[in-house]
Amino acid sequence: MTLLRIDGSYGEGGGQIIRTALSLAALTGTAVRLENIRARRRKPGLAAQHLTAVKAVALLCDARIGGAELGSQTLEFIPGRPVRAGDYTLDVGEAREGGSAGAVMLVLQTVLPPLALAEGASTVSLRGGTHVPMSPPFDYVREVWLPTLARMGVRAELSLVRSGWYPVGKGEVRLVVAGGRRSLEALKARHRGTLQAVTGRALAANLPAHIPERMAARARAVLADAGIAAAIEPAVLQAACAGAGLFLTARYDHCLAGFTALGRRGKSAERVAEEACGALLAHHRSGAALDQHLADQIVLPAALCREESLFSVERITPHLTTNAWVVDRFGLARVDVRLAECGTGLVRIHGNPAGVCHAHP
């Protein structure tokens, strides 16, 4: 059997290569071999959330896997059948003794595209870190990523059972995916239109109520100075450990954009607010439609469209170009990423009129 070889050290060289390759392998029935996984990282190889993603996608398509263990830099993934809808429970903590704050949102973004094209509805419970560094938080996925996918025909609902913060995790979310799609609808977002509203949530877990209130107040003040009114709700959550963060959503005529800042010991509530607001204002001034994170997260779904997707992005990042490279390696769609004169990017994803072609045995 010939396996498609994917160099895990290419470009950004992180976990996104693993996740995108797994999703596309399951969707197309392509057997893959990932090598040099996270080779340039301080702790190379598969981490807990990567291993959970491997096992989760393998469960969806009855894949045979080799090298699925913590720290492994080589992985073989051979799908056994088309993706099957069902009820699944995935625990990032199972991959490491004592639990993990591994990012469950990244695992969710790995399993959702295959389930969206499965024959029936699915329910997925995911346990681990819901608001952790280096990953989109629950609020971003629910308020920005999923609504953007809804424009592309994906019907899914996400709810928070309990929040999980770094370093303990132990949060839980529930995802319901309708399934039944043969392909997705192309995303057209070259121009974003007028800013309609900015909303947000200032959250703190196991911390005094004044912390989210201070984050919300400072964020409203910073945005007001820039001429933007914002409706930001402070809230205190229960969790297994303390945590705090501010999550902002900018709603334009034709798109959404999201911005996050997390707290940590020694970082003031006001600084958290200023960080999130700074990201929002930088995006707003760029004139682009998609924020830099949404752009790389939408490449894979756009590759599942029959028609061409086109969108502008605030900034071209290594995550974006690396994800485009992985999609190109599968031959499912061609991705063009170009730098515009103003420093923003323009992404064109040429759809596949034949749709997703399965090569399962």
Swiss-Prot record:
What subcellular compartments does it reside in? Cytoplasm
MF terms in GO? ATP binding; RNA-3'-phosphate cyclase activity
Q: Which reaction does it catalyse?
A: a 3'-end 3'-phospho-ribonucleotide-RNA + ATP = a 3'-end 2',3'-cyclophospho-ribonucleotide-RNA + AMP + diphosphate
Which is one Gene Ontology cellular component term of this protein? Answer: cytoplasm
Which amino acid positions bind ATP, per UniProt? Q109, H293, L294, A295, D296, Q297
Protein family per UniProt: Belongs to the RNA 3'-terminal cyclase family. Type 1 subfamily.
Q: Which HAMAP family match?
A: RTC (MF_00200)
Protein name, as recorded: RNA 3'-terminal phosphate cyclase
Tell me the name of the encoding gene.
rtcA
